[in-house]
Amino acid sequence: EFEAAIRTVCEPIFEKPLKDISFGQLLLRLFQTARRFNMEVQPQLVLLQKTLLNIEGLGRQLYPELDLWTTAKPFLERWMRKRMSPKAMLDNLQGQLEQLPHLAQMTRAALEGMARPAHGAPPPRDRHILRLLGAALLAGGVLLASRAPLNVADAWPGWLMLASGLYLLVRRQRFPD
């Protein structure tokens, strides 16, 4: 549904010269769409809006017949080939693998902290909540890991959820009710 809304906003400007495009209206509609889907608008997007409005004004003065999409297509294709190349994916995977040991330690500490009662708090009467959380994490992890794109590095949140869910379900054997 979100994709269709974005397509509805953006398709009317494809293959139009710069003189026929209002970036102000385009960005306003994009922000309205984001709000409609309860998405937070990042400060960087406001800066992007300002930059695009400046480009629009300058472009209309210098070359109003410019077709941005035709002009930008070779640059965007080259950029995408570079970003999705095997070397770029390997570099991305390597960077994420370097973070995994820290992430695993932080996740374990957080899960163990959830399992221990807070200082001065009464001991939990029902540990079913942790089991339910474990089952939810396990199910979510399976869904995320199975729907991950071809880039294996993007699947780590699903695997992390899967591992956390398994930990919460298995740890009950060490700490029975």
UniProtKB/Swiss-Prot annotation:
Disulfide bonds: none annotated. Coiled coil: none annotated. Pathway: Cofactor biosynthesis; ubiquinone biosynthesis [regulation]. Keywords: ATP-binding, Cell inner membrane, Cell membrane, Kinase, Membrane, Nucleotide-binding, Transferase, Transmembrane, Transmembrane helix, Ubiquinone biosynthesis. It is found in: Cell inner membrane. One of its GO terms (biological process) is ubiquinone biosynthetic process. Residues 1-130 form the Protein kinase domain. InterPro entries: Kinase-like_dom_sf. Its main location: membrane. The keyword Metal-binding does not apply. The chain crosses the membrane at residues 129-146, 152-170. One of its GO terms (molecular function) is ATP binding. Its EC number is 2.7.-.-. GO terms for cellular component: plasma membrane. It is a multi-pass membrane protein. It is an enzyme of class 2 (transferase). Belongs to the ABC1 family. UbiB subfamily. Is probably a protein kinase regulator of UbiI activity which is involved in aerobic coenzyme Q (ubiquinone) biosynthesis. This is Probable protein kinase UbiB. It comes from Azotobacter chroococcum mcd 1. The lineage of its organism: Bacteria, Pseudomonadati, Pseudomonadota, Gammaproteobacteria, Pseudomonadales.
